[in-house]
């Protein structure tokens, strides 16, 4: 399909999409579906490849050809509504999370700025998701704090805040929010929160039990099931279980282009030296920086004939992002510098910058490896102090290395 920017809004039609996408949740918890998508995929930092920037002179100029399936997000009229629909914005954020396409998150951000005050809690949460997608965690937390100050029983906002705290390495604060959700008998939100917390603590056995319980209760809903299966695959990968393949493959069976699942499965396969399988799986992947990096890393490790070409292409992606003022996913760029360029010093510098705002398992892993390669054990002092404060054992991170 074609993207024409002569209009200023995006439409998703009626509530059919909403009923289908959120059908697994009770009516008061529709927001959880969007939350699971956005928070699971936001760390990917995926930025779609872009052609050279030009300024069009004709209103009918085709700026870019977008992937199949975007038609539902495009304008159905050339007349822009004065106030965009929150449902439209949520659809954009959900699709951006599934596809890794930052263009859609940017569009959602622009539409959010046009909503009239005062912001409802639903709008505050959507703005927080958009902020997290661009890695502005401070703004995201501020928005969620505002929502919870207005309504301490906003369980969706509390779950969102806990997830961001986990990404930033504040397990102590996330534990409080998870506890509040559980004590408040918010079964769905509490379970998702506890799964994320136990995974980050490195308790794969407990996380697996929680996910298995939800899988048994999920019924036939494809969206919830796909999310849970991918999460179960990540847990198995971190634990070194041999059944990780089946979990990832079951998740991909219903959504072969799901960015989050593809990236996690690719990391798992590469960690086990199965690089040729990664190349087969990512032969025609969604065009995101994160998946293209996985492809380049696999080609490099396998000695593939196109490895040099893929590495050069990845470098151009990062150069273009910097040229237009966009910061690529720092841990991915650090991986590129360390593994594909052999520049441990630059990789360590970037990994340290990344660690200031993201402290997930993969963030810790790239920092440790970059410091080791650069012969800079002193660079890990901050990491070690933080791990002690959060009662984490760095020797048992269980990461499926990138």
Where do the protein language model's features map onto the residues?
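Canonical tetratricopeptide repeat
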Residues: 87, 126, 160, 193-194, ...
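Register position in tetratricopeptide repeats
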Residues: 94, 133, 167-168, 200-201, ...
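Start-of-helix register in tetratricopeptide repeats
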Residues: 83, 90, 122, 156, ...
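Residue-level recognition of tetratricopeptide repeat
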Residues: 90, 94, 129, 163, ...
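Alpha-helical adaptor scaffolds
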Residues: 129, 225, 312-345, 352
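N-terminal leader/linker segments that initiate helical-solenoid repeat arrays
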Residues: 44-122
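Short coil turns that delineate tetratricopeptide repeat
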Residues: 118-119, 152, 185-186, 219, ...
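Alpha-helical repeat scaffolds
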Residues: 105-113, 138-146, 171-182, 205-216, ...
């Amino acid at each position: 399909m074609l993207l024409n920017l002569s209009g200023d809004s995006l439409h998703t039609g009626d509530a059919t999409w909403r009923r289908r996408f959120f059908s697994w949740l009770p009516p008061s918890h529709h927001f959880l579906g969007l939350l699971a998508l956005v928070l699971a995929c936001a760390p990917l930092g995926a930025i779609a490849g872009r052609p050279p920037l030009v300024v069009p002179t004709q209103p009918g100029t085709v700026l870019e050809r977008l992937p199949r399936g975007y038609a539902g997000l495009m304008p159905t009229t050339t007349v822009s509504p004065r106030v965009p629909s929150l449902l439209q914005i949520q659809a954009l954020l959900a699709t951006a999370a599934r596809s890794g396409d930052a263009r859609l998150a940017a569009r959602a951000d622009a539409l959010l700025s046009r909503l009239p005050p005062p912001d409802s809690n639903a709008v505050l949460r959507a703005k927080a998701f958009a902020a997290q997608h661009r890695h502005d965690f401070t703004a995201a937390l501020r928005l969620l704090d505002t929502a919870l100050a207005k309504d301490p029983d906003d369980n969706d906002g509390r779950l969102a805040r806990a997830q961001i705290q986990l990404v930033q390495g504040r397990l102590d604060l996330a534990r409080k929010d998870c506890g509040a959700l559980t004590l408040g008998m918010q079964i769905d939100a509490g379970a998702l929160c506890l799964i994320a917390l136990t995974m980050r603590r490195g308790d794969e056995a407990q996380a697996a039990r929680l996910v298995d319980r939800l899988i048994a209760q999920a019924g036939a809903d494809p969206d919830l099931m796909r999310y849970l299966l991918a999460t179960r695959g990540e847990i198995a990968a971190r634990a070194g279980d041999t059944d990780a393949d089946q979990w990832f493959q079951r998740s991909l069976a219903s959504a072969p282009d799901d960015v989050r699942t593809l990236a996690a499965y690719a990391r798992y396969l590469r960690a086990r030296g199965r690089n040729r399988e990664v190349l087969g799986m990512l032969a025609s992947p969604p065009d995101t920086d994160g998946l293209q990096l996985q492809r380049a890393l696999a080609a490099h490790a396998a000695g593939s004939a196109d490895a040099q070409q893929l590495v050069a292409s990845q470098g151009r992606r990062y150069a273009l992002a910097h040229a237009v003022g966009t910061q690529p996913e720092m841990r991915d760029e650090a991986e590129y510098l360390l593994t594909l360029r052999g520049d441990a010093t630059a990789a360590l510098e970037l990994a340290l910058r990344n660690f200031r705002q993201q402290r997930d398992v993969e963030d810790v892993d790239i920092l440790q490896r970059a410091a080791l390669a650069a012969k800079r054990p002193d660079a890990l002092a901050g990491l070690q102090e933080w791990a002690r404060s959060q009662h984490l054992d760095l020797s048992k991170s269980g990461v499926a290395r990138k």
